[in-house]
Swiss-Prot record:
GO cellular component entries: chloroplast; DNA-directed RNA polymerase complex; mitochondrion
Transmembrane segments: none
Gene Ontology MF, one: DNA-directed RNA polymerase activity
Gene: rpoB
Organism: Agrostis stolonifera
Family indicated by similarity: Belongs to the RNA polymerase beta chain family.
HAMAP family in UniProt: RNApol_bact_RpoB
Transferase is among the record's keywords: yes
Name used for this protein in its record: DNA-directed RNA polymerase subunit beta
């Protein structure tokens, strides 16, 4: 991206910048805006006035470190001090008071709330303003409507009916004449007719009765209130009626806000000042005029495209935090008013400090924020699976959430890619499933204009006049409503020097159409081939050779890759790996130059300008997804370092580059059906040499409570009735020792809960004690923390958190080492995913002509139908790179250089590798990229040449250890009496419709009957079956129906249908009627 040396250099912006910019705007502007709105609290009886000032507010440094907040489950926050003034009679007091704590964003762009990293996603919403649309009714007549959307998301509609009357629909039920609405908003009929372009249409529809209703503002308000609130009878005009209307209608439906006012002025060509943020009668009349123009053909028939990004706005972290701050200040106002009343009852002299007390009033701020972060749908637990996930999570944009769409009701059009998304929202990166198209990711060069909430994309200006004025071409950021006026050359730039004219005719984008036009007519040009993609999409090499659906899967699966114990750089990459790793902040970067004094696994000591600085390292810390975060020092003692150099590397990074997987030797061939339907065959080398071994940390916690009788639980090693073997790892306090190896069922923390025995269970001696001395004999129940199934591992940390003597929480962290095994999920970077089906001894794997056994065998049938041919280019180029000891970083869309550029590159590198290593099999002209390989079991060559190569394969977080599950007995659902669902609840395996068909196909009637009735929901039979199975007896037959049949009968009864069944006696054919 450089040109003429360093002149006019363009770099990719910081990936976390969007979150930081939003938070800075909140701190610098939004806090002052909300404090300005805080009213003066007056108490007229006692001549008291309390006021907060926005000027000169201060935020203190957080009182605890980020690490301690996570360790002790606290909120990382900063105290806010504001100037306050209290007028009491003739006494004026000024003080700087603390009004509470505000959560502070850390260097990852996240917040720490109660010890958990959380992040706020950017929401994309319909912008406030007016939108017009026309649609045909069932008779084929065009209906024109205008929708006014307020800043709060409230909607009002303007419509013209068949009789050419104009109505305003203020909610779903009621519609009100436009004249009544305008009059209620303060206009008289004369003003209305003076301010519209079609007065004759306005005069044509009201009859005498309606004209009477709008004679005065009071009558119009009464009429409006009657229709809006659906109230009948005679109403009398009053102030309270006006207040109710103000609160219920005007505040919710008529506040346009700053963005809405700008949109309204633009759409209707008005010149109302920006500070008029409410809907005015002038707006309503101008909107109605436009609607009449559309209906009667005098206006332009321009339906608004609701999916165009110019009609959308971004609600960033700043907007959401500002709303919550306003809410907290509202609560603070009520609390201060209560305190003022209390002060006068006690007749004490108030000060600003006594009105805002830390215990009752200023706690409102932090509780408001903690509630927001805990319950708001767009506040999510920060995904820390790997460094890529940490970088990408803050760049998500979502249409879901309050005021937005829902996954069940969103239309296809609102999910689709729109031409205005180019360079702003990635056309590939979105979630799979019900939310497809509703959550997206920002393109790598996109930025958010926080003032107006639009997404901007950068372009190079290449217009002739500007080129004369300035030698250096300038980068312009275009918002979605501006780029419609430009001819934009698509990303076809060959050179990074954008002054070069490339071809006479180029493909371009203009007004959402794709054209081919002369180079002279181009205004701006895209600056980078990656410009249209998100980070996930930009990490896929040869993405232009893949189907978009597979690229989508790939960008999602890279976020699920587990950091491996020994990471490895990819041979074939795109060049974005370094910046992704850097912006994820998992590595330690030198902030100043100096000399390394010493390094160990916990800290690095750096001597810089006479001072020794200690730089702490992350050591086996658990992430939110149970992966292991760990930093390893990469600088030797005594080495001089420069500012910006890497001192220690985090998980899944090598040499400052992202390293999510491993380069392994793969072959595309079928092998005895073991790679049928995306299954993958692997060599035991991947297990024994710890190639795909990862570390995972599980957290287990237990808390002591006070029982209903008032006695406290206690943590102890002295637990009766338990085998010594289960308690072997406990120290004298009853907590597991650091470094001990624990297995399933072992006690991690011993705990006893006291219980008062019931009267009947007393022994005689206890009765005597109670009668003579009044002593209660207590018994204890064992409620220890046991290690659940699949939790075996090494204890690496134990935490005691003691808020008060009786409330103790103990957390135990256990490290697990997991090798790759059958059932684990692996994936490439092209959406080629599969499950490990078999681990073969290396001598049985197919081997190359130089005797090297293959590491993985993929099914070749997974490539043609899925059209992800990029994996073939990657594996062949990876083989050449491995042999030549080279790494490649390839920008996408290299076919713009020449036809078949990717293929030519791969073949030339394979030829080079063949020459260099003197191995003719690496590149054979008859079948380039393929080679004859041998069956490891027999030593015979396979019939056809096979494609081999080095691919970069990731191990995903979907691991068999966390999925596999079995149940013999367990909990049942209360209503249907069938086993509950899910591994977490120790549930059963559902036999559904298709499984029943499969069993029916084999005619196994008895097995079907057992599965569907006796074993499932027959209350008596299921206990007897267990007994019969253990003793090898015959399963008894039961005549009464299973529980699900009873549920059906009860449901029929609720519909007034009685259902009974009859039993016919075999002896005398008497009918015995029994109730179900």
């Amino acid at each position: 991206m450089l040109r003429n040396g360093n002149e006019g250099m363009s770099t990719i912006p910081g990936f976390s910048q969007i979150q930081f910019e939003g938070f800075c705007r909140f701190i610098n502007q939004a806090l002052a805006e909300e404090l300005d709105k805080f009213p003066i609290i007056k108490d007229p009886d006692h001549e008291i006035a309390f006021q907060l000032f926005a000027k000169g507010y201060q935020l203190l440094e957080p009182s605890i470190k980020e690490r301690d907040a996570v360790y002790e489950s606290l909120t990382y926050s900063s105290e806010l001090y504001v100037s306050a003034r209290l007028i009491f009679g003739f006494d004026v007091q000024k003080q700087t008071i603390s009004i509470g704590n505000i959560p502070i964003m850390n260097s990852l762009g996240t917040f720490i709330i109660n010890g958990i990293y959380r992040i706020v996603i950017n929401q994309i919403l319909l912008s406030p303003g007016i939108y017009y649309r026309s649609e045909l009714d069932h008779k084929g007549i065009s209906i024109y409507t205008g929708t006014i959307i307020s800043d709060w998301g409230g909607r009002s509609e303007l419509a013209i009916d068949k009789k050419e009357r104009i109505w305003a629909r203020v909610s779903r039920k009621q519609k009100i004449s436009i004249l009544v609405l305008s009059s209620a908003m303060g206009s008289n009929l004369r003003e209305i007719l003076d301010n519209v372009s079609y007065p004759e249409i306005f005069l044509s529809f009201p009859n005498a009765k309606e004209k009477k209703r709008i004679e005065s503002k009071e009558k119009a308000i009464l009429e409006f209130y009657q229709q809006f609130a659906c109230v009948g009878g005679d109403l009398v005009f009053s102030e309270s009626l006006c207040e109710e209307l103000q609160k219920k209608f005007f505040q919710q439906k008529c506040e346009l806000g700053r963005i809405g006012r700008r949109n309204m002025n633009r759409r209707l060509n008005l010149d109302i000042p920006q500070n008029n943020t409410f809907l005015l009668p002038r707006d309503v009349l101008a909107a109605t005029d436009h609607l009449i123009g559309m209906k009667f053909g005098t206006g332009i028939l321009d339906d608004d495209d609701m999916n165009h990004l110019k009609n959308k706005r971004i609600r960033s972290v700043a907007d959401l935090l500002q709303d919550q701050f306003g809410l907290a200040l509202g609560r603070l106002q009520h609390a201060v008013q209560k305190t003022i009343r209390r002060v006068f009852i006690r007749q004490s002299k108030p000060t600003p400090q006594t009105l805002v007390t830390p215990t009752s009033t200023s706690i409102l701020l932090i509780t408001t924020y903690e509630t927001f972060f805990g319950t708001y749908p767009l506040s999510q637990v920060f995904d820390q699976t790997n460094p890529l996930t940490q970088t990408v999570h803050g760049r998500k944009v979502s249409c879901l959430g309050p005021g937005g769409l829902t996954g069940r009701t969103a239309s296809f059009r609102s999910r689709d890619i729109h031409p205005s998304h180019y360079g702003r929202i990635c056309p590939i990166d979105t979630s799979e499933g019900i939310n497809v198209g509703l959550t997206g990711s920002l393109a790598i060069h996109a930025r958010i204009d926080h003032l107006w909430g639009s997404i901007e994309s950068p372009f190079y200006e290449i217009s002739a006049e500007k080129a004369k004025k300035k030698k250096a071409r300038q980068v312009v950021y275009l918002s979605p409503n501006r780029d419609e006026y430009y001819m934009i050359a698509a990303g076809n730039s060959l050179s990074l020097n954008q002054g070069i004219q490339e071809e006479q005719v180029v493909p371009a984008r203009y007004r959402q159409e794709f054209l081919t036009i002369a180079w002279e007519q181009i205004h701006v040009r895209s600056i980078f081939p990656f410009q249209y993609f998100s980070i996930g999409g930009s990490l896929i090499p040869f993405i232009e050779h893949n189907d978009a659906n597979r690229a989508l899967m790939s960008s999602n699966m890279q976020r699920q890759a587990v950091p491996l114990s020994r990471s490895e750089k990819c041979i074939v990459g795109t060049g974005l790996e370094r910046q992704t790793a850097l912006d994820s902040r998992v590595s330690v970067i030198a902030e100043r130059e100096g000399k390394i004094v010493s390094t160990d696994s916990h800290k690095i000591l750096l001597s810089s300008s006479g001072k020794t600085i200690s730089i702490p390292l992350v050591n086996h810390r658990r992430s939110n997804k149970n992966t292991c975060m760990h930093q390893k020092p990469r600088v030797p003692r005594g080495k001089s370092i420069k500012k910006g150099q890497i001192l220690a590397e985090g998980a899944a990074t090598v040499g400052g580059e992202l390293a999510l997987g491993k380069n392994v030797l793969v072959a595309y061939m079928p092998w005895e059906g073991y790679n049928f339907e995306d299954a993958v065959l692997i060599s035991e080398r991947l297990v024994y040499e710890d190639i795909y071994t990862s570390f995972h940390i599980r957290k287990y916690e237990i808390q002591t409570d006070t029982t209903s009788q008032g006695s406290a639980e206690k943590i102890t090693k002295e637990i009766p009735h338990l085998e010594e073997h289960l308690l072997r790892n406990l120290d004298r306090n009853g907590v597991v020792r650091l470094g001990s190896w624990v297995e399933t069922g072992d006690i991690l923390v011993g705990k006893l809960t006291p219980q008062i025995a019931s009267e009947s269970s007393y022994i005689a001696e206890a009765g005597l004690l109670r009668a003579i001395f009044g002593l209660e004999v207590s018994t204890s129940k064992e409620t220890s923390l046991k290690l659940p199934i699949g939790g075996r591992g090494r204890v690496i940390d134990v935490k005691w958190i003691q808020r008060d003597p009786l409330d103790i929480m103990v957390r135990v962290y256990i490290l697990q080492k997991r090798e790759i095994k059958v059932g684990d999920k692996v994936a490439g970077r092209h959406g080629n995913k599969g499950i490990i089906s078999k681990i073969l001894p290396r001598q049985d794997m197919p081997y190359l002509q130089d005797g090297t056994p293959v590491d993985m065998v993929f099914n070749p049938l997974g490539v043609p139908s899925r059209m992800n041919v990029g994996q073939i280019f990657e594996s062949s180029l990876g083989l050449a790179g491995d042999l030549l000891k080279k790494h490649y970083r390839i920008a996408p869309f290299d076919e713009r250089y020449e036809q078949e550029a990717s293929r030519k590159l791969v073949f030339s590198e394979l030829y080079e590798a063949s020459k260099e290593t003197k191995n003719p099999w690496v590149f054979e002209p008859e079948y380039p990229g393929k080679s004859r390989i041998f069956d490891g079991r027999t030593g015979d060559p396979f019939e056809q040449p096979v494609l081999i190569g080095k691919s970069y394969i990731l191990k995903l977080i979907h691991q068999v250890d966390e999925k596999i599950h079995g149940r013999s007995t367990g909990p049942y659902s209360l209503v249907t009496q069938q086993p509950v669902r899910g591994r977490a609840k120790q549930g059963g395996q559902r036999v559904g419709e298709m499984e029943v068909w499969a069993l029916e196909g084999f005619g196994v009637a008895h097995i079907l009957q057992e599965i569907l009735t006796y074993k499932s929901d027959h209350l008596i039979a299921r206990q007897e079956i267990l007994n019969a199975t253990i003793w090898g007896k015959r399963i008894p037959n039961h005549e009464d129906p299973p529980e699900s049949f009873r549920v059906l009968v009860r449901e029929l009864r609720s519909l007034a249908l009685e259902l009974n069944h009859f039993l016919v006696s075999e002896k005398n054919f008497q009918i015995n009627r029994e109730e179900v």
